[in-house]
Amino acid sequence: MNKGWAVIINPQSRAGATKKKTSIIKRLLNSEKIHFSYYKTRRAGEEINIVERAVEEGFRKFICVGGDGTIQKIIAGIQIQKVCDPKKIVIGIIPLGTGNDWAKSIKVPLNIKRAIRKIKEGKTKKRDLGVVVIKGKREIKKRYFISYSGVGFDAFMLKRLQKYKWLGKYAYLACSIANFWFYKNTRISIKGEKFSLSKSVFLCGVGVSKYTGGGMQIIKNPAGNNGLLNLTLAHDFTKIDIIKNFFNLFNGSIFNDPKVLTVVSSKIKMVPKTGSLTCHGDGEIFGSGNLTFFVLKKQITHIC
């Protein structure tokens, strides 16, 4: 039986502004004769449980109303559920987050009406899904990322970002300017299929999509559907290097710096030389430990 679409909305997305759009979204979905059931998250991470329950109820199509964090958790829920092949589940997006990085990467309109029209048209594409296995002292965790995951400065900033959230899309910029003086490079061993190196890292991450962190372009020319991770490594940065390159993170010209390396691999391992290595993904702290990254090729079926 066709259950239609399960619409999952995060009312706290964009500092609560998404909640005000609910009635408009429902009206537009009805006007397009899109059959749907409505689910609202009440706490962080509830998207995963909602997806698991909805799949058990027969839903095979989901609409995410929110930002990158909401999308990431819905897709994680699709992977975790045991009822059907995750590739057979379709996800559409009405992007109402602060950054909407994934929506930009897959060229989903940021306008609500146009995004809903895309869902109505029903055209789909396949996209890669990133995975990181975090081997900590007491447990091993597996987390999924739709855009970018890494270590270094951006993970350092995420721990301090909460008090800047009220600034919306400028939160990361303000947090970075206020706190970059306190960051110290971390020496990391990094291994891929055809490379092995040890560097003092300012920023090191892997991605399957172009944008992250509210528009930063840290990943160079990701295909997003070839089963490969694109790694970017900024090493031996001084405070002057950070200042010089800060805005280059947003326009893509950071790759012109000789201290920035890029490489492609299907599997990448990162191990700290000393201490603990904190990993983040899609704007969320995932955990600390030794890291192994890989890709589930064309694992996501999304509206385009």
Q: Regions from the language model: what does each represent?
A:
Residues 1-65, 76:
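ATP/NTP phosphate-donor binding region
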Residues 165-171, 214, 220-241:
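Gly/Ser/Thr-rich active-site loops/lids in small-molecule metabolic enzymes
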Residues 184-186, 200-202, 225-229, 264-266:
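A generic structural signal for short beta-strands and their flanking turns/coil linkers
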Residues 192-193, 198, 223, 233-304:
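ATP/nucleoside-binding phosphotransfer catalytic cores, i.e., glycine-rich phosphate-binding loops
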